[in-house]
């Protein structure tokens, strides 16, 4: 039987300078009790503006600093908090591992999930999957979800203030989206959702690649100077949204297989996508 072609993406995507100040306005329809799963840097860079967005509101908020990797034990810890605090919405605030752990927590507990990436180092915020690790940092599995996140909110000023190495890593990750998708299409492989690859999915992946080539150098300069520019905004969209939605609707190929194997060799302090780029 011929594969059904399909597309999926986050239900809502918000990006721009000062977006954190609009968090409650944009997300209030989801619930009243919020668990923010934060990296250390994510908490420091976002907590103040998030609280400003809740001014005058009586919503319950709990900020929990994330333990480092999206491991089985860390996800279980967050699940327990959701249950005891009667949480409505899980919010990831941080990089790829915090995002993956929060997505898994929301999925297992049947809650809504919002993603606030604080670096543009991976396309994890927009994808419908998590990378799960063992407690020693080695790869465990991909956890696939029936849908993508309920919402993704990116404050461009937060990304501009993050170390430029993370932006470069995200560009390296996004660089492979089109070529991995093209390889999958040529070999008639299924998409990550086990369906046929759509023209829309390939168009998004190609636009991601073209955006990187056109704006990448200027975006790096902007990030080095901690300023938001049209070029930086374009690259943020490419690394977070275009790469994530593109990858979800095409497929991965050799670079991701290479990365998964390398995690078993140690050296987990290296930026995730630095390993992936080596395979490209």
Language-model region placement:
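ATP/NTP phosphate-donor binding region
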Residues: 1-89
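Structural motif
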Residues: 12, 33-35, 61, 88-91, ...
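Short glycine/serine/threonine-rich phosphate/pyrophosphate-binding segments
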Residues: 20, 43-47, 72, 97-104, ...
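A short, small-residue-rich loop immediately preceding and capping a beta-strand
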Residues: 82-105, 109-118
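Active-site segments that bind and position negatively charged phosphate/pyrophosphate groups
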Residues: 192-280
